[in-house]
Amino acid sequence: AYVDQGTMVDTWATVGSCAQIGKNVHLSGGVGIGGVLEPVQAAPVIIEDGAFIGSRAIVVEGVRVGTEAVLGANVVLTASTRIIDVTGSEPKESKGYIPPRSVVIPGTVPKQFPAGEFGVPCALIIGLRKASTDKKTSLNDALREHGVSV
């Protein structure tokens, strides 16, 4: 694993082998950053500079979190997790990458199974980190500004 300068790794946070954590990142309590040793072609988790990863969030399987993005508590990101940007008039879906300065919370999407319809986890991009949350105030404010408890 590589953890760059100025990064804060809080209590019970883990960073797996081969993960790359940028400068001035905040890994909150209980965060799990996955690592990969094999297969050789597997992509590492990359958390870019200035990102804030909320309590108990899990990021694995080659996911990349963009510069200054904010992941709320309990967000789970794998290579197959649906990431849905709900900030525009129509949702935009992607996988594996959180754009810079995005504010992300856990969500669910309906899926039909033989026993009925159930919600499966996804990640929702609910806005962009505002300048008011940069360095002057707690990054938790990025979530509070969007009405999300932290």
Regions found by a protein language model. Name each.
Residues 1-112:
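Structural signal for interior beta-strand "rungs" in well-ordered beta-sheet cores
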Residues 95, 100-102, 106-150:
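Terminal amphipathic alpha-helical/low-complexity segments used for targeting or macromolecular assembly
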